[in-house]
């Protein structure tokens, strides 16, 4: 079938399944999208270093992503959510080209309503329904106060 590097987007604290975020870009990813629950797929890895989750405990967290870059951070966000009392201030900044390309929209809405997560969504090209910030993913930094000495960033 093929192979491609794909990020796990589910929390490692959830057992018995994993969630992957895969954009359709060619034959291999098209085949993945057509798979049904219960189909078998081979996996290799994990590759990379992961996040220093245990070292992050007790600190503020700043997570910044654009587009598909939110997929691996979603895993970290969900893990932080599962152990929320272990962390200080949590700030999430996510940017997308336009509102229709905002990934995990329902989950962002849930995070937005939490009082213990600061969430900033921004798009480059808003439509009439957009009520978030407009501009590059760096736009929210104009008004954020970050304690650099006590903050882990990803």
Question: What is each stretch, according to the model?
Answer:
Residues 70-84:
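Histidine-anchored nucleotide/phosphate-binding helix
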Residues 55-60, 64, 74-78:
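Acidic/glycine-rich phosphate/pyrophosphate-binding loops and surrounding catalytic core
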Residues 93, 97-154:
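Reductase modules of NAD(P)H-dependent flavoproteins
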Residues 1-39, 96-98, 124-126:
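Ferredoxin-reductase
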Residues 66-67, 154:
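A short acidic Gly-Thr/Ser loop motif
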Residues 40-45:
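A short, hydrophobic beta-strand micro-motif
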Residues 46-57:
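A short, basic/flexible loop-to-alpha-helix module at the beginning of a structural domain
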């Amino acid at each position: 079938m093929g192979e491609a590097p794909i990020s796990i987007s589910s929390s490692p604290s959830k057992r018995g399944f994993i969630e992957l975020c895969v954009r359709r870009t060619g034959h291999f990813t098209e085949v993945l999208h057509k798979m049904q629950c219960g189909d078998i797929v081979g996996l290799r890895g994990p590759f990379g270093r992961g996040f220093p989750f245990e070292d992050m405990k007790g600190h503020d967290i700043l997570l910044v992503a654009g587009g598909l870059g939110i997929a691996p951070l979603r895993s970290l966000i969900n893990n932080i959510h599962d152990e929320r009392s272990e962390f200080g201030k949590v700030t999430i900044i996510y940017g997308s080209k336009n509102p229709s390309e905002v990934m995990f929209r329902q989950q962002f809405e849930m995070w937005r309503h939490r009082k213990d997560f600061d969430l900033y969504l921004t798009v480059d090209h808003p439509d009439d329904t957009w009520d978030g910030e407009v501009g590059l993913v760096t736009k929210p930094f104009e008004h954020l106060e970050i304690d650099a000495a006590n903050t882990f960033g990803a």
